[in-house]
């Protein structure tokens, strides 16, 4: 323990005059006080002097049967008074820092490393003094750690929202247990359909090469084919395929007007053989046409069409894509039925031949959502991912489809509209058109 050479010149009040309320200077003891008698408990005791940093307690011992106080000059048994605090302690970060600084100063006081004002300072003392100064310089204002955590959480939540909006929904996750949905191959299947629709794309100007057939005649034929489709309760796949067969055949062969209905009947027959489980007989189709053709003529036209198309019957139609896109859109039965109505209406219009089947299906979904949803968005990331079309890319087709839907209310070709006015299909043909 280092000794303190120069005592501090601080005036203190004597212990006896103050009645023990104050402690004298521990480093300076008056000579007059050494050896003075003091009455303790009615007895006279010998008062011992108190050395620097010596024992501050009053020890008693028995001298001739009477208790007297003596002060032992011992540096080994230093006992510092412990402060008590009866208040409820609220622990804060700033209070913890202050308490730590106070503890450091107390420990330095006990160990005797507190320097005198004029005394030398060794390395250990200097390090302790610097530590205490650093403790005193720390701001006592508590740090609100919760504020920092809240800011970090807000940033993470914003990033999570952005990530969720940018990632399309997996629409096949709930069909993994169903082997008929072929979830493992569905992406490859529709990639193949997209390749097929480009390979089998129909010339949008083929009607110009027909000298006897115009757009109006084609529309009448397709509307009559829809009536036959409804009468025999055929599948929607059969209708779309039969119209595709007619367009592909007319794009390669010029025919007279008298053969146009025969081409339509034969196209329905071929589509039924390809799609239906039980196909109507040839005589049924002949009867439906009011005997406009014979059984032999249907057989002969069937041979010609298959030869011209090289027996190529597997094509991509709007219905293939429509079901997939409706699933991506999360459409209910009413919206899906309206989408089918718009797709089948597009088959009547020759101008819609310029669009590939996937585009017609995507535009049908878009227009149907416009007509049934009170507010947007009408196109989202999931639809963009599964349709492979942005909203800006389908607007032209959607505008054409909207005009087709508007003309259907006043057109004489009412087979498609009549079909979708039935309660079975939720009367979606009566839903008014929305301008956009």
From Swiss-Prot:
Record has Oxidoreductase as a keyword: no
InterPro entries found in the cross-reference section: Cyclin, Cyclin-like_dom, Cyclin-like_sf, Cyclin_C-dom, Cyclin_N, Cyclins_cyclin-box
SUPFAM superfamilies in alphabetical order: Cyclin-like (SSF47954)
Disordered as annotated region, ranges: 1-33
Superkingdom assignment: Eukaryota
GO cellular-component term (any): centrosome
KW Manganese (keyword) present: no
Record field: compositional bias (Polar residues): 1-17
CDD domains in alphabetical order: CYCLIN_CCNB1-like_rpt1 (cd20507), CYCLIN_CCNB1-like_rpt2 (cd20509)
Keywords: Cell cycle, Cell division, Cyclin, Mitosis
GO biological process: cell division; G1/S transition of mitotic cell cycle; microtubule organizing center localization; mitotic cell cycle; response to calcium ion
Family that this chain belongs to: Belongs to the cyclin family. Cyclin AB subfamily.
Quaternary structure, from the entry: Interacts with the cdk1 protein kinase to form a serine/threonine kinase holoenzyme complex also known as maturation promoting factor (MPF). The cyclin subunit imparts substrate specificity to the complex.
Function: Essential for the control of the cell cycle at the G2/M (mitosis) transition.
Protein name per UniProt: G2/mitotic-specific cyclin-B
Organism placement in taxonomy: Eukaryota, Amoebozoa, Evosea, Eumycetozoa, Dictyostelia
Name of encoding gene: cycB
């Amino acid at each position: 323990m280092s000794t303190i050479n120069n005592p501090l010149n601080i005036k203190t009040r004597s212990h006896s005059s103050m009645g023990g309320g104050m402690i004298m200077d521990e480093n300076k003891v008056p000579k007059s006080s050494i050896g003075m008698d003091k009455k303790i408990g009615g007895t006279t005791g010998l008062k011992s002097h108190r050395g620097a940093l010596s024992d501050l307690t009053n020890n008693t011992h028995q001298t001739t049967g009477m208790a007297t106080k003596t002060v032992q000059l011992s540096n080994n048994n230093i006992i510092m008074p412990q402060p008590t605090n009866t208040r409820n302690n609220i622990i804060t970060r700033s209070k913890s820092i202050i308490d730590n600084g106070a503890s450091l100063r107390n420990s330095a006081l006990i160990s005797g490393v507190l320097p005198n004002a004029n005394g030398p300072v060794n390395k250990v003392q200097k390090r302790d003094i610097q530590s205490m100064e650093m403790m005193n310089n720390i701001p006592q204002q508590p740090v609100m750690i919760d504020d920092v955590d809240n800011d970090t959480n807000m940033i993470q939540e914003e990033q999570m929202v952005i990530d969720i909006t940018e990632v399309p929904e997996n629409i096949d996750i709930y069909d993994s247990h169903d082997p008929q949905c072929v979830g493992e191959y569905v992406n490859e299947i529709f990639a193949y359909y997209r390749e097929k629709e480009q390979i089998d794309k129909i010339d949008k100007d083929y009607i110009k090469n027909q000298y006897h057939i115009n757009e109006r005649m084609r529309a009448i034929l397709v509307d009559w084919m829809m009536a036959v489709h409804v009468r025999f309760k055929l599948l929607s796949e059969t209708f779309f395929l039969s119209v595709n067969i007619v367009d592909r055949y007319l794009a390669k062969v010029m025919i007279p007007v008298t053969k146009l209905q025969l081409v339509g009947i034969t196209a329905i027959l071929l589509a039924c053989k390809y799609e239906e489980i039980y196909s109507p007989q040839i005589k049924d189709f002949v009867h439906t046409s009011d005997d406009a053709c014979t059984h032999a003529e249907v057989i002969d036209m069937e041979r010609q069409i298959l030869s011209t198309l090289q027996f190529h019957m597997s094509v991509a139609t709007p219905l293939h894509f429509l079901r997939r896109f409706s699933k991506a859109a999360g459409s209910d039965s009413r919206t899906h039925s309206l989408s089918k109505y718009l797709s089948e209406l597009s088959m009547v219009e020759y101008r819609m031949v310029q669009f590939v089947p996937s585009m017609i299906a995507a535009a049908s979904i878009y227009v149907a959502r416009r007509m049934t949803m009170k507010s947007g968005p009408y196109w989202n990331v999931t639809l963009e991912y599964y349709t492979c079309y942005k909203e800006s890319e389908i607007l032209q087709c959607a505008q054409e489809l909207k005009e087709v839907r508007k003309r259907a209310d006043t057109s004489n070709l009412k087979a498609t509209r009549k079909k979708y006015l039935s309660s079975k299909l939720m009367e979606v043909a009566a839903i008014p058109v929305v301008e956009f």
